[in-house]
Amino acid sequence: MEKFEGYSEKQKSRQQYFVYPLLFQEYIYAFAHDYGLNGSEPVEIIGCNNKKFSSLLVKRLIIRMYQQNFWINSVNHPNQDRLLDHSNYFYSEFYSQILSEGFAIVVEIPFSLGELSCPEEKEIPKFQNLQSIHSIFPFLEDKFLHLHYLSHLEIPYPIHLEILVQLLEYRIQDVPSLHLLRFFLNYYSNWNSLITSMKSIFLLKKENKRLFRFLYNSYVSEYEFFLLFLRKQSSCLRLTSSGTFLERIHFSRKMEHFGVMYPGFFRKTIWFFMDPLMHYARYQGKAILASKGTLLLKKKWKSYLVNFSQYFFSFWTQPQRIRINQLTNSCFDFLGYLSSVPINTLLVRNQMLENSFLIDTRMKKFDTTVPATPLIGSLSKAQFCTGSGHPISKPVWTDLSDWDILDRFGRISRNLFHYHSGSSKKRTLYRLKYILRLSCARTLARKHKSTVRTFMQRLGSVFLEEFFTEEEQVFSLMFTKTTHFSFHGSHSERIWYLDIIRINDLVNPLTLN
């Protein structure tokens, strides 16, 4: 009981920063101004169609809403500057946009304060390293070698918009703010697909709809909060058979207290969720749950997650969305890498005096490779090659200068190598580089109405240097020009970078136009 209350208080402690009543005052501009961490420029809100609104406009609009004459004029003159007229195109594209984005700025303030409260400056680089996407792969490499089963999860969706508001009620104590949130959700009823479709959730980031992104992150945060709580409580069940019954009663009492807040959810005992080695990772609406337990234990966790979504989020989760695989016999797609834990057999001959014998050693290794087919499909969708991987020119870029074309192709190639530097096999990456290099040459040749061979002879080594990665440039400085050096063997080792904070656009085809 005390442990649960202490765990909940850590989450509730953030409520002291929630100042939502200020949303209905003109002082919102001061908070939004400080939120931008820039004392000279106000916060810019990027809305639909790439329109930018200053937070100063939010302040002026809220002041205007408080003016009684404005509301009277809106009623007496419905065709003149009516705020709540949904048929008014200017309202749809401007007033509602800056109000919803301004609301999102305010509700993000408590979360930003938590992130900015770093204890010391010397710990900031370490915190930034943990933000890197590549930082999770060394963790998987260290932990997955000792695990047996892997579950592929999908965050429950679609989620009803009213449930999103109810989830925020536990954190937001300001009733008018919740009413305003419901107003935005009702107005954006045609945006319902942004929450109810995972494909649209990725497009949500592209549209930069801050309000809906905040709602989705809050929903996922609540989902993981209860999952983490139950995982931590299950660790106390590692007892012998003689003491299981007493601990089971003690644990059920905790669940009864927990059921006061959410009645009707924990009606079944969950004493069988005993797994001290369980790891959870999530990205893009998907998650993986790995453990060292038996297959029966994983099936029970699967049943629990299905009931969890049904009782708490009022969502019927199909059991097919949770797949259970054995780590040594399968591979999984994670953040653009095809990862697996194969068992490598090593035969060692041991000589002892006059006797010799062979030792068969089996070792696990966390392996990451680059999937060729999805990346070639992304390049094909971006019009760099055909569906079979044959390079083609990109006519849209022929109006650019030669150096701009070279820079764009070279930057895409270097970013691909940089992001997939952790692959144990670089053959796919060199194939992608060949596609981009030849596509660049054909684009330049098409612009100058020349042949590819003629244009490559004209540029010479300058054309090739644009496609060198940072590692290849270092290796090229170590050898003279007369030395024949192959870069294919220099990248046999995997390299993880701690400065990658976003996934490559070509890795996620949904981000491409």
Curated annotation (Swiss-Prot):
Q: Name one Pfam family in it.
A: MatK_N
Q: Which UniProt keywords apply?
A: Chloroplast, mRNA processing, Plastid, RNA-binding, tRNA processing
Q: Which GO terms describe its molecular function?
A: RNA binding
Q: Name one GO biological process term.
A: mRNA processing
What the entry lists under InterPro entries is as follows: Domain_X (IPR024937), Maturase_MatK (IPR002866), Maturase_MatK_N (IPR024942)
Its predominant location is plastid
For this record, an example GO cellular component is: chloroplast
Location in the cell reads: Plastid, Chloroplast
Q: Which family does it belong to?
A: Belongs to the intron maturase 2 family. MatK subfamily.
What functional role does this protein have? Usually encoded in the trnK tRNA gene intron. Probably assists in splicing its own and other chloroplast group II introns.
User: Could you tell me what this protein is called?
Assistant: Maturase K
Query: Organism source for this protein?
Result: Phragmites australis
Organism classification: Eukaryota, Viridiplantae, Streptophyta, Embryophyta, Tracheophyta
